Amino acid sequence: EESTAWPKVTGDVEDGGLGFSLKWNMGWMHDFTEYMKLDPYFRKDNHHMMTFAMSYAYSEDYILVLSHDEVVHLKCSMINKMPGLGFDKYANLKAGYAFMMGHAGKKLLFMGQDFAQLREWSEERELDWYLLEEPEHQAIQSWMRDLLHMYKKKQALYELDQSWEGFEWVNADDAYR
């Protein structure tokens, strides 16, 4: 985890880099979680929060991380960051995870996020596995399974995700559609 703009974290040592394989994309994580917290009505005015990371996505070899740091210390679980009630919260979470899978960079979800753990994570207790008896949590788990299977099957989603050649904007500024 490196949270500054230190250059060449994943650059070759021979070229002055640090030689790490991947760097956590902290900027993407912050913008993504803040955007997803917004009521959908207000998202169009904050569209840049979802597109800005692509302006630097290939400056390092990034991994998109929704880590334990985002679901502890009164920051809420991912599902409880979502606006709305009931169905809307789960629909927002599904949309967010789909966006993440389509974004350049490797992916990492922290435990419990794949079935919408309700409580914040704590090292003092296990995950709330009983939630998988509830249809909405089963649906999130199935959604994640299907997204991951699609990601694995569709090489275009990962094959060139560390190169500009693997991405093309259709319209980065179409916030009002």
Language-model-detected regions and their locations in the chain:
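Conserved alpha/beta catalytic core and glycan-binding cleft of carbohydrate-active enzymes
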Residues: 1-122, 152-177
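Short, contiguous acidic/charged loop-to-helix segments that flank catalytic cores in large enzymes
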Residues: 82-89, 130-138
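Active-site His/acidic residue clusters
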Residues: 121-130
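Aromatic- and carboxylate-lined catalytic core of secreted/periplasmic carbohydrate-active enzymes
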Residues: 131-166
